[in-house]
Amino acid sequence: MTNKLLDALAQAETVAITGHVNPDGDCVGSCMGMYLYLKENYPGIRADVYLKDVRESFSYIEDLDKARERFELGDKYDLLLLFDVSSRDRICVSQEILHSCARSVCVDHHVTNPGLGEENVIVPEASSTCEVLFGLLEEEKISKAAAEALYTGIAHDTGMFHHSCTSGKTMRIAGTLMEKGIDFTRIADVSFYTKTYRQNQIMGRTILESIMLLDGKCIVGVVSQRVMEFYGVTPKDLDGIVDQLRVTRGVEVAIFLYAVGTQEYKVSMRSNGGVDVSAVAQSFGGGGHVRAAGCTM
């Protein structure tokens, strides 16, 4: 069976790796998992990771401090690896990176991904991009450090193995990564459950000021630029709010909007199963999954 990722790597000497804006655990985990795998198994390849606005809670991932936040025009690579990116406008750091690489491979699990790379490995039924990536790598060559990154992505996109996207295959892969000796308890505590006081404050305020619509079937929370400035937070501090809104009894859809610019809002949507929020997001130029999607308005 053809492995598009490994086939492309066999012909590359320089590789750029990137994910999506406001990178979550799956994005960070897949990008860094790939970087660490290359570092450990492809000494002849020079690889650079491009990620911006990464949450401090992921700092335990090895070499994350080497990620670049800016793409310099003029930089050239043999291969671009795109992870967890469903559309061109969601590419982290700069879209110019698309034009600076001779080839590109996109690895993703978003059903709305049109095929962003020249070669694509898109598996919508997978729990996460990290699950897809695991299937493309040689298991025995995955180190403990790379396993930590991959486990992080799977754990986050499954909501610590709670969401319906979790399958038996997902659990078997997670078990394999655990057997590499990773501290899975620490990963959960540090990157998923632990919140700063300010994060708890703004989550509490958002829930307090949220409104119920459609006879309680839809809940909406909003964070304005003014409120973000008041609490001294940035978009990366808002992780988890939409999921907390979703678990409200009787709610079928949760919508969370937060300011990202003047008269511009990022919209995150979650469904408890009866509504395909990816279809809603697509109508506004966004995308995602049936139960988790987003767009910018």
Each predicted region: which residue ranges?
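Short alpha-helices
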Residues: 109-173
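Short glycine-rich anion-binding loops that position phosphate/pyrophosphate groups of nucleotides
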Residues: 21-23, 85-88, 110-112, 225-226, ...
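A glycine- and small-aliphatic-rich helix-loop capping segment at beta-alpha/alpha-beta transitions
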Residues: 40, 97-104, 138-139, 168
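Short glycine/serine/threonine-rich phosphate/pyrophosphate-binding segments
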Residues: 25-31, 88-92
